[in-house]
């Protein structure tokens, strides 16, 4: 009998273990993932955060799929926008299913029995997420790309924006 239930602070250790496995898997499958998180340190950080926030912070939500053991989780937060549409969205941060239980409907159950009823109860009409280059699973499932994150190292950006002879944009401002 599979059950999807909200996680609570007592689940933080199991969540951290699964997140560590997800981070390690992602670094192998998507070596250019940004930002890079050490699987152990990243899992420890998020596990501690979940332990602190679950049950006390209504914007932090995690659902577990369990049978006799925990087989997967979906974690995310409600994001509000002071300006723009939609005014709020649920941002999915992590979805993970233990490898030996994949392709058995667990991920669908986490969305169907955990996230979607929550969104309906709270008037949330949009679910968002972020993925890494090369991870095409979301597009295959009908998710639309709405934004692309970009990054540049500070040292490289410093070279990009260095003053050059002929720059006149701020000559008067520096005097």
Residue ranges and their predicted role:
Residues 3-18, 23-29:
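A short beta-loop-alpha structural element at the N-terminal edge
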Residues 80-92, 102:
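A conserved beta-turn-beta hairpin within the catalytic core of GNAT-like acetyltransferases
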């Amino acid at each position: 009998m599979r059950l999807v239930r909200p996680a609570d602070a007592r689940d933080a250790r199991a969540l951290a273990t699964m997140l560590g496995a997800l981070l390690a898997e992602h670094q192998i499958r998507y070596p250019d993932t940004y930002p890079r998180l050490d699987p152990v340190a990243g899992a420890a950080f998020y596990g501690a955060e979940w332990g602190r926030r679950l049950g006390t912070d209504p914007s932090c939500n995690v659902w577990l799929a369990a049978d006799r053991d925990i087989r997967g989780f979906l974690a995310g937060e409600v994001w509000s926008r002071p300006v723009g549409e939609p005014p709020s969205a649920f941002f999915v941060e992590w979805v993970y299913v233990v490898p030996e239980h994949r392709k058995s409907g667990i991920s669908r159950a986490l969305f169907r029995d955990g996230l979607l009823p929550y969104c309906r109860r709270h008037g949330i009409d949009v679910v968002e997420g972020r993925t890494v280059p090369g991870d095409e699973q979301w597009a295959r499932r009908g998710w639309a790309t709405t934004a692309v994150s970009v990054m540049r190292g500070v040292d490289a950006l410093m070279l990009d924006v260095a003053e050059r002879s002929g720059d006149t944009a701020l000559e008067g401002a520096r005097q």
